Amino acid sequence: LREEGQRIRSLPGVDQCVVLSTCNRMEIYYWSNEPENAQEHILSHFLGDGRGELDMASYFYSHQGEDALGHLCRVLSGLDSMVLGETEIFGQVKTAYHTALDAGITAACANKTFQKAFTIGKKVRTESQIHAGATSVGSVAVELAEQIFGDLSGTRVLILGAGEMSRVTGRALHARGAEGIYVANRSFDRAVELA
């Protein structure tokens, strides 16, 4: 993410940026005195100049000003997740922000925005019950498996992939008594590490 953030920061019109990339989202938070120009360069960076027959730009969304801050706060609080209140996203945003900070591609505006959003996200999580119950895609998947297959104690399970969601799912399966947890991944070393 550091290198991608530096590439985006070097695009015309982009003054500061933070790149958030998870298994479920890719978001670019950027600051610019020329937002339309910067957005066009960011889209071209990802899509190329020849966008072809399919208008890929229609699959992107954009927020500006207070709407962008509101979106970031919804992301941090788990309101904009596949599983309402999921907890992993807060740490993922924090990592993305610190990566950008360490790379020197943020400044006062980005720093102030993210600090304010972290405060709001924490407040929403601590003052509401949004985090009650299953709060990750992995834990919801395990609950669904229990509804379909019954007790998971002693079962053998194959997890596809070795990313963070697979790690969370593996922990949830182990906690429910699954004994044979196998991992299939394109990288053998990462699969072994997770197993």
Protein language model regions, located:
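Long, contiguous hydrophobic alpha-helical segments, chiefly transmembrane helices and signal peptides
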Residues: 1, 26-29, 85, 120, ...
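Glycine-rich phosphate/diphosphate-binding loop of Rossmann-like nucleotide-binding domains
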Residues: 142, 146-195
